[in-house]
């Protein structure tokens, strides 16, 4: 993979188009690593089963969540590219690392929904109150909030895909729902792509705690 160079009128035109779907920011967004040839789908191991039951309130947070993932690509996009970009998140994540596990969960739940067209962009949104539980000594501090925003791009000679990611999380008193999803769903595959770190609960074999 290499950064494209504006050597032809066609590429100049493409750059002008792409510029419209990027935030105005002087800092160059990070690039995803080289795309592998093998893109076989596989189901994640059992530890990726999300929380199904909570018996205690230790290290538990009830959070009002807003998630948005905007996909920009002049020629359309495939989930193969999106999955590969998400595999690089640990290396290029710029937000609060005590809440990176929450960000992964929210991004994947967001991308599991139906996108809405917005110009050349496809926008996935999630607004929900959810319950999260972390393993001991992990997760956000009491009362800590999250405002995370980052742009990540895939750019080579033939294709440009940009992701604009926004996730906010605020602790609230509204009763949330436990985050859960079908094991065969797209979100569960994305969790494994992003190496979501969990730990099986000692109390309940079907419950998992976030480790990040």
UniProtKB/Swiss-Prot annotation:
GO terms for molecular function: structural constituent of virion. It is a peripheral membrane protein. Its main location: virion. InterPro entries: Rhabdo_M, Rhabdovirus_M_sf. GO terms for biological process: viral budding via host ESCRT complex. It holds the Pfam family Rhabdo_M2. A motif (PPXY motif) lies at residues 45-48. Keywords: Host membrane, Host-virus interaction, Membrane, Phosphoprotein, Viral budding, Viral budding via the host ESCRT complexes, Viral envelope protein, Viral matrix protein, Viral release from host cell, Virion. GO terms for cellular component: host cell endomembrane system; membrane; viral envelope; virion membrane. It comes from the Viruses. Residues 125-161 are annotated as: Essential for glycoprotein binding. It is found in: Virion membrane; Host endomembrane system. Late-budding domains (L domains) are short sequence motifs essential for viral particle budding. They recruit proteins of the host ESCRT machinery (Endosomal Sorting Complex Required for Transport) or ESCRT-associated proteins. Matrix protein contains one L domain: a PPXY motif which potentially interacts with the WW domain 3 of NEDD4 E3 ubiquitin ligase (Potential). Most abundant protein in the virion. Plays a major role in assembly and budding of virion. Completely covers the ribonucleoprotein coil and keep it in condensed bullet-shaped form. Inhibits viral transcription and stimulates replication. Plays a major role in early induction of TRAIL-mediated apoptosis in infected neurons. Homomultimer. Interacts with nucleoprotein and with the cytoplasmic domain of glycoprotein. Belongs to the lyssavirus matrix protein family. This is Matrix protein. The gene is M.
């Amino acid at each position: 993979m290499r950064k494209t160079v504006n050597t032809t009128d066609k590429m100049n035109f493409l750059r002008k188009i792409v510029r419209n779907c990027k935030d105005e920011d002087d800092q160059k967004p990070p690039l995803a690593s080289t795309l592998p040839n093998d893109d076989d789908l596989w189901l994640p191991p059992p530890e990726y089963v999300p929380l199904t039951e909570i018996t205690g309130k230790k290290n538990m947070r009830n959070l009002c969540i807003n998630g948005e993932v905007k996909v920009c690509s002049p020629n359309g996009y495939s989930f193969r590219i999106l999955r590969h970009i998400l595999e690089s998140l640990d290396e290029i994540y710029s937000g609060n690392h005590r809440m990176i596990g929450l960000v992964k969960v929210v991004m994947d739940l967001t991308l599991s929904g139906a996108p809405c067209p917005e110009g050349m962009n496809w926008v996935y949104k999630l607004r929900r109150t959810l319950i999260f539980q972390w393993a001991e000594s992990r997760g956000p501090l009491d009362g800590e909030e999250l405002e995370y925003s980052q742009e990540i791009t895939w750019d080579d000679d033939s294709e440009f895909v940009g992701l604009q990611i926004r996730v906010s999380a605020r602790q609230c008193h509204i009763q949330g729902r436990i985050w859960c999803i079908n094991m065969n769903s797209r979100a569960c595959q994305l969790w494994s792509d992003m190496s979501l770190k969990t730990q099986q609960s000692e109390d309940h074999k079907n419950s998992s705690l976030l480790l990040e």
